[in-house]
Amino acid sequence: MSYGKQFNTLLNHLSEGVIIVSEDFDILFANEIAIKYFGNKIIDIPIYNVIRNSELIDAINENRSIDTMFLYNSSIGKHILELSYHHKKNNLGILIIRDKTIEEKFQNVRKDLIANVSHELRSPLTTISGFIETLQNEEIDPNQRAKFLGIMKEESNRMDRIISDLLSLSKIEINMYAELDEKINLIDQIKTAKDALDLRADELGKSINIRYPDYDTPNISADSDQIIEVFHNLIDNAIKYSHENSAIDILVELIERQDRSYLKSSVINVGTPISEEHLPRLTERFYRVDKARSRNVGGTGLGLAIVKHILLRHNAELEITSDIDGKTTFSIFFPVDNN
């Protein structure tokens, strides 16, 4: 293989896009990554007809190097690209293209999370701060004092729940790619979660029923603690948002789907219908359909986000449906090893 072909092969194996520009501003070479973004017909085309970025074009015209960001809409989607142009003494220019789309999205998610956490904690802190000022008045009625202290305790508990759920979510993300080396019986884990919530459901006049096959279902590779947490969150939600004196049904069945076996587990409750536009967003952090009601029942807005991340780790799918009668179903599909 000639040196030139070896060099081209090397450039084509880079994770960044590379474009070489002539002194006449024409594109002499583009590696495979650059072609993926800008198409395979860019050779011999002026660079300013391919990348319409004024900062880059000014730098090329003035024979100077530059680093700039570029939002590009291509046939494969919208991309945030970092453009690093280097002018060489032989009047050639080398443009390095790095895709920052995922990194920028991550940064935006991080910023949104910080903003949401700040907002969620500011509200109870403001309430507590206001009552502290009121309680500093020595002439306040004892009954009022007791009432205010009760509210302060509840707001403090709310902050504790938010922080606890955030720590839980962080732990799940840290262990996202850790090996799942347990073989567990799914029904046993669901029963454990159910048993922990039976008393609370009973106190609210509700019941939790579970149905499963009368034969031994296959075990799945999983983290048993996380699976219990998934069903604890789903059953807890069903208790919170179902009608008074209603039943929460849990159904486990072995199904075939797309030529593979799955253990399908559904948590079903009847309450206020959830509009279709809300369903895809229910697993977002701090997303609530009814913010006031969620806070009143002790929701943090993080329970379903925790469920989502645990299921991602387990390569399991979550489907959520809600009909006009208020029957809401959370169905999870756990893949079963067919071997």
Regions found by a protein language model. Name each.
Residues 46-102:
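PAS-family sensory/regulatory modules and their coupling/dimerization elements
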Residues 200-211:
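Short conserved segments within the C-terminal catalytic ATPase subdomain
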Residues 274-286:
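Short conserved segment of the HATPase_c
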Residues 154-159:
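Short alpha-helical segment of the dimerization/phosphotransfer core of two-component systems
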